[in-house]
Swiss-Prot record:
Extent of Basic and acidic residues compositional bias: 97-106
Organism (species): Cormocephalus westwoodi
Tissue-level expression: Expressed by the venom gland.
Region ranges (Disordered): 87-106
Name the record gives this protein: U-scoloptoxin(20)-Cw1a
Keywords: Disulfide bond, Secreted, Signal, Toxin
Domain of life assignment: Eukaryota
Cellular-component GO terms for this entry: extracellular region
Family: Belongs to the scoloptoxin-20 family.
Endpoints of the signal sequence: 1-26
Amino acid sequence: MNSTDRLLGVLLAVVALILLIRISEANDCDLCGRECVSACGTKMFRVCCFNYNRKRSNMPPLWMPRSKIWEGADDPLVLLQHLAKKSSGKSLTTTKDSSESRKKEISEDKALQFLWRNND
């Protein structure tokens, strides 16, 4: 094998490598939708891809108004009751007692029992 054949082999290998890199870059530009193709190869491409994927996902927004979550979210007891309802399907305050303080004591006891049982 003479030096011309070696040089030709190296040249073909470099051209093949460049083609493979170009093909992979072209596929990467298509991953984030049509609106990001124009930004391919720039700094804004990552931002465009991030926004595109966030739009497509079913993630909840990073911020949600309190009225959308539930009322009384500042009260830890309300939060505990909400968690208990989610896990058991029924309310913690099931007593027919008319005294609000008695209802609160019962619900606090049940909330603490719930936390104690699920403290694994």
